Amino acid sequence: MREKITLECTECKQRNYKSFKNKQNDRDRIELKKYCKFCNRHTLHKESK
């Protein structure tokens, strides 16, 4: 089943992106490099609750 997740910037802690993930395939927390409009650059975003 696909579940809603929120991606949080690791530097400024802003929650910038929402997405879905399949819990059966991805049990770990997702980490992606995405653009943060508050930092004005690409930063690592981690899955948060």
Curated annotation (Swiss-Prot):
Family listed: Belongs to the bacterial ribosomal protein bL33 family.
InterPro entries: Ribosomal_bL33 (IPR001705), Ribosomal_bL33_sf (IPR038584), Ribosomal_zn-bd (IPR011332)
Keywords: Ribonucleoprotein, Ribosomal protein
HAMAP family listed in its UniProt record: Ribosomal_bL33
Gene (name only): rpmG
Listed SUPFAM superfamilies: Zn-binding ribosomal proteins
CC terms in the record's Gene Ontology section: cytoplasm; ribonucleoprotein complex; ribosome
Membrane-spanning residues: none
Protein name as it appears in the record: Large ribosomal subunit protein bL33
GO molecular function: structural constituent of ribosome
One biological process term in Gene Ontology: translation
